Amino acid sequence: MALFKDSSNFFLLAGPCVIEGEDMAMRIADKCVNITSRLDIPYAFKGSFKKANRSRIDSFTGIGDEKALKILARVRKEFGIPVVTDIHREEDAVMAAEYVDILQIPAFLCRQTDLLVAAARTGKTVNIKKGQFLAPDAMQFAAQKVADAGNKNIMLTERGTTFGYQDLVVDFRGIPEMQRFGYPVVVDCTHSLQRPNQTSGVTGGQPELIETISKAAVAVGADGLFMETHENPAEAKSDGANMLPLDLLEGLLTKLVRIRAAL
């Protein structure tokens, strides 16, 4: 991946679930950049400019598309790092591509051909999250849609598989299975711990297992990790129940670098 410097480490996509404001985004980016620089981890800042897929109609969706995208552009410029955001509609692809380096396809949308093709045609790296309903082997077809549209800058992300009602499980056999397609494979260490569609209308999670999933991902040879992190997850406007507190990030990454070095 030309986006990242050469390193023997995994790369990291990390940041808040959604852009809540400029000051917070800059603080989180600053801390993540400092930590990953010290640990020699290639890093891209993640932040959704809009959350289109929410449980309830009154759930927070964003501060405004253009405003959020301009914040992502500021992070990109001031820290000199790649930036990733989700897109949900074909028209989002061209709009977001002006501000970010990686366009992320949400898991629920990973089979949407027109969306994948629109993302591909921007020339940006496309990170496709594996649907909770798909076998790893099926992701070759999502990747092929992007490649056939003329873009081979592709990443695939494991984010858990539906396990009965309101639960997900990560099958780590899927990492080497997807790596066979020739693209970097990322493990989403926070969304894979969601407890979706709770009766309250707010998605739950098991953040106490983030370290477990992260260690397993590195041990099995994942190319990259995806983590959502926040200064105070309890007050986050989206996905707070499965985010990593920002003050725990350095300790966790330090352990993961040691595991990677032992392989």
Predicted feature descriptions by range:
Residues L12, P16-M24, Y43-D65, T229-D239:
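Glycine-rich, proline-tolerant flexible connector loops at the mouths of alpha/beta enzymes
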Residues I63-G64, E78-D92, D101-D114, T125-P136, ...:
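Catalytic beta/alpha-barrel core
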Residues M1-L13, K70, A261-L263:
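N-terminal amphipathic alpha-helix/helix-capping segment at the start of soluble metabolic enzymes
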Residues A14-R27, S55-I63, I81-D86, I105-F108, ...:
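Active-site mouth loops of central-metabolism enzymes
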